[in-house]
Amino acid sequence: MKPMYRSRSWRRKYVRTPGGRTVIHFERKKPKIAHCAMCGRPLNGVPRGRPSELRKLPKTKKRPERPYPNLCPSCMRKVIKAQIRAGISL
């Protein structure tokens, strides 16, 4: 095993080959789930994936198609209400 693969930053995936041997394939781990910028709740509709995987997705699959996609829906409502009450236009 290469020294770079001894680190636990690589995920070990055991694969059975057609010849019957079990070999280890090393993959990078998936990043953590996206969180709301205000309250820290996990965001729905945002995929977990490495940048190389996310690059292959269409734009609409990468984040919610609404204002403030980096906020959860309840925080988004609070921000929009605060802006309207302050008289700031979007």
From Swiss-Prot:
One of its GO terms (molecular function) is structural constituent of ribosome. Keywords: Ribonucleoprotein, Ribosomal protein. Residues 45-69 are annotated as: Disordered. One of its GO terms (biological process) is translation. One of its GO terms (cellular component) is ribonucleoprotein complex. Pfam families: Ribosomal_L34e. Signal peptide: none annotated. InterPro entries: Ribosomal_eL34 (IPR008195), Ribosomal_eL34_C_sf (IPR038562), Ribosomal_eL34_CS (IPR018065), Ribosomal_L34e_arc-type (IPR047868). It comes from the Archaea. Disulfide bonds: none annotated. Belongs to the eukaryotic ribosomal protein eL34 family. NCBIfam families: PRK04059.1. This is Large ribosomal subunit protein eL34. It comes from Thermococcus onnurineus (strain NA1).
